[in-house]
């Protein structure tokens, strides 16, 4: 056995005995879906250590290979699939759940925009991350529109920044789609509606990845994640306190609306339609030179 083989075997042994590391967002859909896995309620799964982070940070953690299981944006997959594989469960896809482009209701142009990207020409725009699905959809939708600046902010700070006038527009995700009117903002574009109208496919937002060097088989990990989601559906009350503990939004009705929108049948299994949606998004983006071509297929044997 070579020294590199000894090192690899030692690392695998340490990983097996140390349990699993999981990195997800603190948003209700993630804490709801992964409550059972994180709390040792899925039989046969070693102890799980959880890290919570904003989606832009999660994408960066995956690029550095820091976690065994990690939630990322589908838009980031072209940079991640050499070290990770896509699991067919636990992610966020759906219909009517896309990112929104928001502006102040006080702006005369906002009321007349109705999905016209030209309203953003010369605008200062806040986004949740450069490798997020939200920003990739934004770039496809607003192709040819020259904005003034693009700045990355933690998603929970985008609406206050637009409200305060520091930005002309904000690209929002998560529970922001339920609460933006309270900030005096209006939606000038629903990028999910735009995507569904253009493709007929669901919106591929967040993916769950597993490290390729894990000793567990990918099928076993997918089954464990699927079991966690199924447990959440079977007993929603079990995760309620943990979900509220980590949520940016504490209103129970908003939290429940968030879960209802983002945790669905695609969270149990991507299926043919889920894979087709992700492939279509990344193929369109690669054609426009917005992302590299995928290094390998999303669906692996």
Task: Label each residue range with its predicted role.
Residues 14-39, 53, 99-169, 175, ...:
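Bilobed "Venus flytrap"/periplasmic-binding protein-like clamshell domains
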Residues 21, 84-91, 124-125:
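A structural signal for short loop-to-beta-strand junctions that line the ligand-binding cleft
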Residues 43-57:
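A short beta-strand-loop structural module common to alpha/beta enzyme folds
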Residues 62-63, 162-163, 285:
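Hydrophobic residues within well-ordered alpha-helices
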Residues 86-113, 196-213:
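Hydrophobic/proline-rich hinge and linker segments of small-molecule sensing/allosteric domains
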Residues 153-245:
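Pocket-lining segment of extracytoplasmic ligand-binding domains
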């Amino acid at each position: 056995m070579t020294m590199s083989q000894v090192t690899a075997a030692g690392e695998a042994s340490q990983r097996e005995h140390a349990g699993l590391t999981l990195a997800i967002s603190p948003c209700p859909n993630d804490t709801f879906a992964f409550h059972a896995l994180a709390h040792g309620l899925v039989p046969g799964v070693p102890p799980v250590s959880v890290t919570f982070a904003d989606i832009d940070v999660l994408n960066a953690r995956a690029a550095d290979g820091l976690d065994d299981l990690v939630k990322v944006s589908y838009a980031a997959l072209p940079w991640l699939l050499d070290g990770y594989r896509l699991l067919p469960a636990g992610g966020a896809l759906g219909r009517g759940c896309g990112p929104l482009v928001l502006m102040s209701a006080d702006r005369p142009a906002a009321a007349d925009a109705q999905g016209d990207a030209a309203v953003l020409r010369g605008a200062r725009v806040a986004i949740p991350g450069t490798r997020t699905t939200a920003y990739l959809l934004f770039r496809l939708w607003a192709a040819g529109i020259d904005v003034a600046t693009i700045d990355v902010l933690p998603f929970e700070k985008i609406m206050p920044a637009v409200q305060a006038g520091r930005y002309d527009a904000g690209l929002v995700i998560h529970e922001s789609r339920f609460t933006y009117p309270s900030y005096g903002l209006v939606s000038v574009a629903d990028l999910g509606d735009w995507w569904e109208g253009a493709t007929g496919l669901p919106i591929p937002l967040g993916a769950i990845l597993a490290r390729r060097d894990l000793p567990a088989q990918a099928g076993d990990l997918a089954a464990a994640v699927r079991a966690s989601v199924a447990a959440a559906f079977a007993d929603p009350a079990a995760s309620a306190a943990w979900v509220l503990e980590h949520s940016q939004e504490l209103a129970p009705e908003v939290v429940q609306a968030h879960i209802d929108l983002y945790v669905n049948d695609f969270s149990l299994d991507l299926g043919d339609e889920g894979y087709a949606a992700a492939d279509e998004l990344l193929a369109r983006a690669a054609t426009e030179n917005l992302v590299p071509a995928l290094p390998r297929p999303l669906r692996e044997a």
